[in-house]
Curated annotation (Swiss-Prot):
EC numbers: 2.3.1.234
Cellular location(s): Mitochondrion
Quaternary structure, from the entry: Monomer.
Free-text function comment from the UniProt entry: Required for the formation of a threonylcarbamoyl group on adenosine at position 37 (t(6)A37) in mitochondrial tRNAs that read codons beginning with adenine. Probably involved in the transfer of the threonylcarbamoyl moiety of threonylcarbamoyl-AMP (TC-AMP) to the N6 group of A37. Involved in mitochondrial genome maintenance.
Full protein name: tRNA N6-adenosine threonylcarbamoyltransferase, mitochondrial
Family note: Belongs to the KAE1 / TsaD family.
Co-factor: note: Binds 1 divalent metal cation per subunit.
Keywords assigned: Acyltransferase, Metal-binding, Mitochondrion, Transferase, Transit peptide, tRNA processing
Cofactor: a divalent metal cation
Positions annotated to bind a divalent metal cation: H138, H142, D349
Length: 405
């Protein structure tokens, strides 16, 4: 009988005769779609934080062979897989698309060709099933993923580290961000990937199928970082901005020197790759930790985060790196703060974080479009209000960091 009533309710809703809320108070449900870079993700999540269904197609193996992400190739792969991925997530959830409360999709920032695939597909669904559309800022979604798992209250400090971004910000609300600092050139994930390619780690027997960042972390476990002396970027700049291009240039010079010493040609594996990996990882970790430490000092001084029970959230693909987490744990321990990171599978791009961000926006009534005409994607997009210049003018000195063992 219950199943029969449920089916009648669904039919009534589908036919538009009554609303779900008229029948029974069901939790709202959002379908999230992610195609900003090289992962095609979809998930169905309800407002209780239950992941009803999810699916992901990763393009990593293909891009490893081409030596990096080629936008046209990524676009083609998204087109080939998006229908299958979305259908798999919906099927796993056990619900009908008519039961969705809204459809949320990444529209910024990212690779334009890839964003376009997700947006076009989503708008087709929106029109077919007559659902509200929720455009999602990719980095906002990363920042709020932790709230799916932990009752983190606003405001909190967030460090977003990935292959495309490096941002320190205060999160004051679902769509309220204040940026303290960002990368002036490339992102840490991009740097680690490029170093891995320069070291030809794709040819290392222990690194088969690993991304550049994964290979660096794996080899660093057995390396001696003290063999290669690398300078921490921007040590004399008392702000919260980041720079990684100079570090990569340092590493390239070290590699060239080692190749000359060993008589090894470019493209061949050096015997000291683990040492170089350990040195690079350590330097990236210290750079991130020092800037984060300054951000904490600044925020507490200015009353931007609570003085007690304050929280640092770290998210994005690079947040999966355990050594970098350890460095940041050192900072939060000394500052009497809690460090929270989503599990690795939710740090990298996925549909769950998009669906959850859609739920949060739906609950707060922010950014929900009942008419999606004119919805568009943006390859570049800022994150909230930028006060990085105020942080620079504060010129806060930080203490040297020793990563806890």
């Amino acid at each position: 009988m219950a199943k029969y009533i449920s089916n009648l309710s669904r039919i009534a809703v589908v036919r538009g005769r009554v609303s779900v809320s008229t029948l029974v108070k069901y939790p709202r449900i959002v379908l999230g779609i992610e195609t900003s870079c090289d992962d095609t993700g979809a998930a169905v999540v309800d407002e209780n934080g239950t992941i009803l269904g999810e699916a992901l197609h990763c393009q990593k193996d293909i891009h490893l062979k081409t030596g990096g992400i080629i936008p046209t190739v990524a676009q083609h792969l998204h087109r080939d897989n998006i229908t299958k991925v979305v259908n798999k997530a919906i099927h796993a959830s056990g619900i009908s698309p008519y039961e969705l409360s809204a459809i949320a999709t990444t529209v910024k920032p990212g690779l334009g060709l890839c964003l376009g695939v997700g947006l076009s597909y989503s708008l087709d669904l929106v029109n077919k099933y007559h659902k509200p559309f929720i455009p999602i800022h990719h980095m906002e979604a990363h920042a709020l993923t932790v709230r799916l798992l932990h009752p983190v209250e606003f405001p909190f400090l967030v460090l977003l580290i990935s292959g495309g971004h490096c941002i320190l910000a205060i999160v004051s609300g679902v769509s309220e961000f204040v940026m303290l600092g960002h990368s002036l050139d490339e992102a840490p994930g991009d740097t680690l990937d490029k170093v891995a390619r320069r070291l030809s780690l794709i040819n290392h027997p222990q690194c088969s199928g690993m991304s550049g960042g994964e290979a660096i972390e794996h080899l660093a476990l057995h390396g001696n970082r003290k063999i290669c002396k690398l300078k921490i970027p921007m040590s004399h700049h008392r702000d919260c901005n980041f720079s990684f291009a100079g570090l990569r240039n340092q590493v390239n010079k070290v590699i060239e020197q080692k190749e000359a010493e060993k008589g090894i040609s470019k493209g061949q594996l050096l015997p000291c790759v683990a040492d170089i990996a350990a040195a690079v990882q350590h330097t990236v970790a210290l750079h991130l930790a020092q800037r984060t430490q300054r951000a904490i000092y600044y925020c507490k001084r200015e009353g931007l985060i609570p003085t007690e029970r304050a929280c640092l959230v770290v998210s994005g693909g690079v947040a999966s790196n355990r050594y970098i987490r350890k460095a940041l744990q050192t900072v939060t321990h000394e500052s009497d703060m809690t460090l929270l990171c989503p599990p690795p599978r939710l740090c990298t791009d996925n549909g769950v974080m998009i669906a959850w961000n859609g739920i949060e926006k739906l609950q707060s009534g922010v950014g929900v479009l009942h008419n999606a005409d004119g919805a568009c994607y943006e390859s570049r997009a800022s994150l909230g209000r930028d006060i990085s210049e105020l942080v620079r003018k504060a010129a806060i000195k930080v203490q040297p960091i020793k990563i806890l063992s």
